[in-house]
Amino acid sequence: MVATVTDEQSAARELVRGWARTAASGAAATAAVRDMEYGFEEGNADAWRPVFAGLAGLGLFGVAVPEDCGGAGGSIEDLCAMVDEAARALVPGPVATTAVATLVVSDPKLRSALASGERFAGVAIDGGVQVDPKTSTASGTVGRVLGGAPGGVVLLPADGNWLLVDTACDEVVVEPLRATDFSLPLARMVLTSAPVTVLEVSGERVEDLAATVLAAEAAGVARWTLDTAVAYAKVREQFGKPIGSFQAVKHLCAQMLCRAEQADVAAADAARAAADSDGTQLSIAAAVAASIGIDAAKANAKDCIQVLGGIGCTWEHDAHLYLRRAHGIGGFLGGSGRWLRRVTALTQAGVRRRLGVDLAEVAGLRPEIAAAVAEVAALPEEKRQVALADTGLLAPHWPAPYGRGASPAEQLLIDQELAAAKVERPDLVIGWWAAPTILEHGTPEQIERFVPATMRGEFLWCQLFSEPGAGSDLASLRTKAVRADGGWLLTGQKVWTSAAHKARWGVCLARTDPDAPKHKGITYFLVDMTTPGIEIRPLREITGDSLFNEVFLDNVFVPDEMVVGAVNDGWRLARTTLANERVAMATGTALGNPMEELLKVLGDMELDVAQQDRLGRLILLAQAGALLDRRIAELAVGGQDPGAQSSVRKLIGVRYRQALAEYLMEVSDGGGLVENRAVYDFLNTRCLTIAGGTEQILLTVAAERLLGLPR
C-alpha cells in the first residue's frame, strides 16, 4: 500500500478497505472479474459496472476534484491511496483510467460527472489518429484503449498533445477486445471525423500522472500478492511443518517484502511530487515509481504463485488474476524498460528529486543550532570533534549532558545545519555502539570515564563478539570468564574483530555461567586492550589490507568495575549495542554522493545498452533508498516505529553499494583488468552482505519478525 503521511490518506484508504471487506462488495468484485472473462461467450462483459458504481459512491473519483466541480478538494496523494486499495481488492472496471481523467479534464460539467461516477474514462495506449485542427475532429484507428467501453470518454495521444473524445457520439465505434487482464475493459476504437477536444494539460504531464496512478495500482498488487503468499505459508504444511518455516520460502517472502516496500514509497513519492510546481519533480518521481512498480507487481505475482504451489496454478484461485493485472499495468505503461530509460535520461540531464521532511515543529530551534554549528565551523579541523562533543551536536540523540536528548525532528535539523556549514560529524565506529550501552546500563563511574573520552576521540573501541565456529551467533559463544579475586579471568578466541590492533578498549561478551541456557549466562565486559594475555593477529583481507583481526584471550584479567550491567545479563545488553541507531537522512542529493561521483566519472562516456540499463537500475536503487530514508525519518518524527522500512533499507542498501562498486570498476580505466581504486572498492564491498549479519540471516529475520513466518 502507498505509504501514508496524513490522517486524511489513512481515512481514505480505510474507507476503500472497509468497503472491500464487506461480503457484498468483496464477493461482487471477484465475481464480476470472473464474469467478465466469460463476457465474450456466456458471461457479462459489463459486470464491472455495478461494482464500479459502488466504488464511485465512496467518493474515490471525486477525492482530488475541486469542490466547485462536485469533488472533495483533496490531493492526488489521497486519490492514489484509494486507487492502491482498490487494486488490492481487484476492483474491476476503468478505475485507474477514470482517476487519471479526473486530474486532466478541465470541463467542469464532465469533471463533475467523472467525480460522481456518472461517466467513466478510458486511456488510449497508442495514437494512430489524424487531427483536423480546422474542424476539431479526428479520424483513424486506435488499437488499444484501456478502460474503453461504450458510454465512456477516452483520452488519446496525438501529435504531442492529448485529446478527449466521447464514445457516445455516432462518429466513434468501440470494438471490445479480449484482454489478458479481463478485470479491465479493453477496446479497439475507430474514429471517423469524431469531435475532439485538446486537453489544456501538457502531454508529458498526462503521461506522468498516468504513470503515478498506475504505480499506485502496481503497489496494491505487490502488497496483495505478498500478503496472500505469507498467509498461505503460515498454514500450509509439508513434512509435518508449515512451509513458512522453510528457509527457502522465508527468503522468497522476504524478497517480496523488499519489492513491495520499494513500490510503496516510490508510488507515494510520485503522488506527492504531483503537487510540486516544478514539473521535473513529477517527471523523475513518476518514472521511478512506474519502473519500480511494474517490476515489483510482476515479480511478486509470480512469486506468490510459487509459494502457493499447485493451488496457485488453478483457475479457481485469485492469484492469476493479480498476475494478469500486473502485466496489464506493465503493458499499458509500455513496460518498465521505457520508464527505466527515462529515469536514466532525466538523471543524466541533471534532474534530481528534492526530498525533505517537515520540521516545522522544531523550526524555532534553528537559530540556536545554526549559531552553535557556526562556532564549530570556525574552529580548525582538529578541534571540531571536541567542540561537537561538548555542545551535544556529535550525538544529539543521546541524553544530556552527552547529547541533547534530541527528538527525531531536532536530529534532522541538526544534520541539515551541519551539512550547510560543511561540518562533518566524525565516525566513532564501534564507539557508536559501545557508548549508548554504557549510558543505558553502566554505572555513573563507567559513564563518566568512557563516554566523554569516546566522544572526544580519545578512546577507539573494538567489538569482541564473533568467535570461530559461531560467527555472529552470539548464543553459541565459548569464551569463558572465571571468577578471580576482584574480577574475572577471560579465556577464549575472538575473530573478525575490526581495528583490534588499534583499539584502546573493547566490548567483550564472555560466558560466566556455562550451565545456563545459551542466551543466558553471558556477561558484558569492558576490556583494556593493553592488558597482559591479549594477543592480536591481523587477518589479511581480499583487498590486501588488515583491518580484521583474531584476538586470543589467555587468562585476561578484567576487574569487577569493568562489568557493565548485571552478571549473566550480557545478552540483553548486546541487543542494545546492536540496535542503537540515530535518525538520519541524506542532506545532499537524493541519489547520494557515491552515485553522484559515478555520474561524474561517466561524464560523456558512451555506454552500450546493457550499461545504460544497469546504470538505470542503480539509480532506481539509490532513489528507493533515499525514499525509504525519508519514510523512516517521517515515521520517527511522528513517533511511529519504522518497522519493515528500516529492515528493507538495510537489505537493499548493501546490495546497492556492492552493485555500484562493481559497475564503477567495469566502466573505469582498466575495466577491472588493471588494479586501481575502483577494483579496491569493489573487493572491499564484498563484506557488506556478511558483516553484522549476512544477507541471508537478515532475510530470515525479516520473514520471521516482520512477516510472522514460523521458526
UniProtKB/Swiss-Prot annotation:
Induction: Induced by cholesterol and repressed by KstR. It comes from the Bacteria. Its EC number is 1.3.99.-. Binds 2 FAD per dimer. Its cofactor is FAD. One of its GO terms (cellular component) is plasma membrane. GO terms for biological process: cholesterol catabolic process. Keywords: Cholesterol metabolism, FAD, Flavoprotein, Lipid degradation, Lipid metabolism, Oxidoreductase, Steroid metabolism, Sterol metabolism, Virulence. GO terms for molecular function: flavin adenine dinucleotide binding; oxidoreductase activity, acting on the CH-CH group of donors. The keyword Repeat does not apply. It is an enzyme of class 1 (oxidoreductase). Pathway: Steroid metabolism; cholesterol degradation. It catalyses: 3-oxochol-4-en-24-oyl-CoA + A = (22E)-3-oxochola-4,22-dien-24-oyl-CoA + AH2; 3beta-hydroxy-chol-5-ene-24-oyl-CoA + A = 3beta-hydroxy-chol-5,22-dien-24-oyl-CoA + AH2. SUPFAM superfamilies: Acyl-CoA dehydrogenase C-terminal domain-like, Acyl-CoA dehydrogenase NM domain-like. Belongs to the acyl-CoA dehydrogenase family. Homodimer. Contains two ACAD domains separated by a short linker. The two domains interact to form a single active site. Involved in the second cycle of side chain dehydrogenation in the beta-oxidation of cholesterol catabolism. It contributes partly to the virulence by increasing the efficiency of beta-oxidation. Catalyzes the dehydrogenation of the five-carbon steroid side chain of 3-oxo-chol-4-en-24-oyl-CoA (3-OCO-CoA) to yield 3-oxochol-4,22-dien-24-oyl-CoA. Can also use 3beta-hydroxy-chol-5-ene-24-oyl-CoA, and shows weak activity with cholyl-CoA and deoxycholyl-CoA. This is Acyl-CoA dehydrogenase FadE34. It comes from Mycobacterium tuberculosis (strain ATCC 25618 / H37Rv). The gene is fadE34.
